[in-house]
């Protein structure tokens, strides 16, 4: 094994981490909770709710006024890392650990839930890393060194879900992963993986989780992000929590390691504390035997990092007033780009600052025992019990899901009949469950269910082979790389002159080593159209490339606008010479309806690529959201994760007038690549000049969409009337040209 150690005054050497990786094995298994330090004295102060301090850390900015103290709150602090390049994530993990994170959650690449087995090597991901043994092993090895540096165990975490859940669970147990997401309901509701397969797989996965002593987090919080109105799924959330919690306990997971993933459902300008606190109280009343993983609200984040941060501080007030064993953080830039280094650190510092600032709060205040708080909490519990009873009356969970009972936009028992429905005899993995024969035997540890080892006279299954990979890690077959091009060695070679330590060059970066990304914050004493155009002109004059405005905040409709822009590295401005962006051209509802009555219109639409987002597209098309259906446009919705080929083929089969492609994930410009691919396929099939092609998504810009082959692109803030107007006017153009 390499004798490489971190130098506190030097950069981490990722090449050294990768050296001799095939011989690395984790030095510990299981989750590590922080050690409480009641009555902790630091500087001139005494703390009531803190944990043992770190050996090495970066204090909050004002700490120099107080002797550079850096008290650590009691809850575990989570940071989620999702750059797509694990080698860069290792550096970010070190940053986060020094700012108080001891739970590093690694996000998977888009679509990995649907992979039917393990993958190997170190390919680049989209919106996360492709979780492979090599990448897990390298990051766990790095965290071993980082936790020695900061003086506290660091928990490494990823996801045990999808079609290959048990395969991943085995690998995670082997490689010393400390925490996991595991909830078969996530597979069923959000990934459309067959129900029976999902629950059978979950039994095997949870058995391994129990063996490894991992903390398990459920997936109920996804209902918050998916529901039309997040505060209306609170009763259902408690039922989802209950199903996974008791299921996990019965399989054998220790209740002290079963964590409920709870999210305050609202954000201001809603009266969020008034709505969210009774829910938090009700949840903790019902599930006092289990741990609480307090997530932060993501559904209502916009592009303002300030607004997101305030929302997250309010979320942590609820954690403090109730309880949180794990305080997850969300980067405040999640609403505008793949999270950057600096915002992972901002999120960690926000959690530390807020929780330490509220130290000792519950010695001075208490939640009222009567009145609105308790009455509302009881009401929510009653609604949850009614939900559970109705689910049982319907024949159980599977039947209830098939009937669309979950993620309905009504506050149960109110129903709007728009929930997510999955078929018992449908979904990915259908028909893959096989009953074990009477002589079935698997010589492995932590195996769920029937295992006939008595026929061989063994007491422990793995004794038959001298121990399985869980007991004897030398039996693990380590595969380094499978792809000669898509791997970390190639990526690191491309930027080797920027690699620390001993770099020859340095560039600013936000996501990847030497990516050259910078951000500019500007204020212009003008309306938003002029301010946006002027900001872009500033960036051009600074010779930035890949320029994009990522946030616009109106200070006053006429007096001023705050702009944030990003670009890559490689002044009075005459406003009259600026090319101002045009406001959306919107026809009246009557005008649009009249044209559709004149000539009916048929469109096919779906979320393309390996992308499961659906809410935004639904708002564009659904009649109940004021979408294009209300004008009489015939809509054929193909769902999520739609391959570009399927969208074009559907347009051909249905003789559609238009294709609508939604694309939310923007990592590595995958949204524009998919737009370009759809345009190319339609051209090759000979229909491109006969069909209107519209693309949309939160990160889609009109000009870039058109440059990649779409007729128009619609970004954040677009509505059904904007899209309908464009469809009608574009059809007029094609009619004049004799193409429609």
Where do the protein language model's features map onto the residues?
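Domain-level signal for soluble alpha/beta catalytic cores
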Residues: 1-2, 24-37, 113, 336-337, ...
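Active-site mouth loops of central-metabolism enzymes
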Residues: 15-26, 74-91, 153-164, 227-232, ...
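Active-site beta->alpha loop and helix N-cap motifs at the rims of alpha/beta catalytic domains
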Residues: 29-65, 77-99, 103-234, 555-557, ...
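Short beta-strand/loop segments at the ligand-binding rim of alpha/beta enzyme cores
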Residues: 68-81, 148-160, 213-214, 285-299, ...
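Glycine-rich phosphate-binding active-site loops on the catalytic face of alpha/beta enzymes
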Residues: 100-113, 175-192, 244, 315-338, ...
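Catalytic alpha/beta core domains of metabolic enzymes, predominantly
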Residues: 127-131, 140-144, 160, 181, ...
């Amino acid at each position: 094994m390499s004798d490489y150690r971190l130098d506190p005054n030097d950069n981490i050497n990722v090449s050294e981490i990768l050296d001799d990786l095939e011989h690395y094995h984790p030095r510990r298994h299981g989750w590590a909770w922080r050690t409480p330090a009641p009555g902790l004295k630091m500087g001139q102060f005494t703390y009531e709710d803190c944990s043992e301090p770190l050996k090495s850390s970066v204090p909050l900015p004002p700490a120099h006024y107080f002797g550079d103290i850096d008290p650590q709150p009691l809850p575990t602090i989570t940071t989620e890392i999702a750059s797509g390049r694990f080698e860069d994530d290792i550096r970010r993990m070190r940053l986060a650990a020094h700012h108080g994170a001891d739970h590093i959650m690694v996000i998977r690449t888009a679509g990995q839930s649907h992979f039917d087995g393990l993958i190997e090597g170190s390919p680049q991901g989209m919106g996360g890393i492709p979780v492979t043994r090599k990448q897990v092993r390298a990051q766990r090895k790095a965290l071993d060194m980082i936790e020695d540096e900061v003086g506290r165990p660091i928990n490494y975490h990823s996801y045990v879900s999808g079609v290959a859940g048990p395969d991943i669970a085995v690998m995670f147990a082997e490689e010393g992963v400390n925490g996991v997401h595991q909830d078969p309901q996530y597979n069923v509701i959000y990934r459309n993986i067959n129900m029976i397969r999902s629950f059978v797989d979950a039994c095997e996965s949870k058995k391994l989780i129990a063996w490894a002593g991992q903390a398990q987090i459920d997936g109920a919080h996804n209902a918050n992000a998916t529901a039309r109105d997040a505060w209306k799924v609170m009763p259902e959330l408690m039922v989802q929590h209950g199903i996974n919690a008791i299921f996990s306990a019965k399989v054998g997971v220790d209740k002290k390691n079963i964590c409920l993933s709870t999210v305050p459902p609202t954000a201001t300008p809603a009266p969020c504390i008034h709505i969210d606190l009774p829910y938090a109280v009700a949840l903790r009343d019902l599930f006092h035997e289990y741990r609480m993983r307090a997530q932060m609200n993501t559904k209502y984040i916009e592009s303002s990092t300030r607004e997101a941060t305030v929302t997250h501080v309010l979320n942590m007030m609820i954690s403090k007033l109730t309880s949180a064993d794990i305080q997850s953080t969300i980067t405040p830039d999640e609403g505008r780009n793949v999270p950057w280094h600096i915002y992972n650190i901002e999120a960690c510092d926000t959690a530390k600052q807020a929780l330490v600032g509220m130290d000792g709060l519950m010695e001075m205040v208490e939640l009222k025992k009567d009145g609105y708080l308790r009455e509302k909490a009881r009401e929510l519990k009653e609604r949850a019990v009614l939900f559970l009873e109705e689910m049982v009356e319907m024949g159980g969970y599977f039947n209830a899901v098939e009937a669309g009972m979950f993620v309905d936009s009504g506050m149960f028992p109110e129903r709007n009949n728009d929930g997510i429905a999955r078929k018992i005899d449908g979904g990915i993995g259908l028909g893959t469950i096989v009953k074990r024969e009477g002589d079935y035997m698997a010589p492995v540890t932590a195996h769920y269910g029937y295992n006939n080892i008595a026929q061989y006279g063994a007491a422990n299954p793995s004794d038959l082979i001298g121990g399985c990979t869980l007991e004897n890690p030398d039996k693990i077959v380590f595969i380094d790389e499978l792809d000669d091009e898509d791997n970390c060695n190639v990526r690191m070679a491309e930027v080797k002159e920027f690699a620390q330590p001993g770099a020859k060059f340095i560039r600013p970066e936000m996501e990847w080593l030497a990516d050259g990304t910078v951000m500019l914050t500007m204020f212009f004493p003008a309306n938003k159209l002029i301010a946006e155009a002027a900001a872009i002109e500033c960036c051009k004059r600074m010779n930035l490339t890949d320029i994009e405005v990522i946030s616009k905040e109106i200070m006053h409709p006429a007096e001023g606008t705050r702009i944030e822009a990003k670009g890559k590295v490689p002044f009075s401005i005459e406003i009259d010479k600026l090319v101002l962006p045009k406001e959306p051209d919107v026809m009246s509802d009557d005008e649009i309806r009249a044209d559709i009555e004149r000539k009916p219109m048929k469109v096919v639409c779906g979320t393309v690529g390996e992308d499961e987002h659906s809410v935004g597209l639904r708002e564009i098309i659904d009649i109940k959201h004021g979408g294009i259906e209300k004008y009489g446009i015939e809509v054929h919705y193909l769902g999520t994760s739609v391959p570009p080929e399927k969208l074009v083929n559907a347009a051909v089969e249905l003789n559609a007038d238009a294709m609508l492609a939604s694309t939310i994930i923007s990592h590595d410009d995958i949204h524009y690549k998919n737009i370009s691919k759809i345009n190319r396929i339609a051209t090759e099939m000979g229909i491109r000049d006969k069909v209107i092609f519209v693309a949309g998504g939160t990160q889609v810009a009109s000009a870039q969409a058109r440059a990649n082959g779409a007729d128009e692109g619609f970004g954040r803030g677009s509505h059904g009337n904007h899209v309908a107007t464009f469809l009608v006017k574009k059809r007029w153009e094609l009619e004049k040209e004799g193409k429609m």
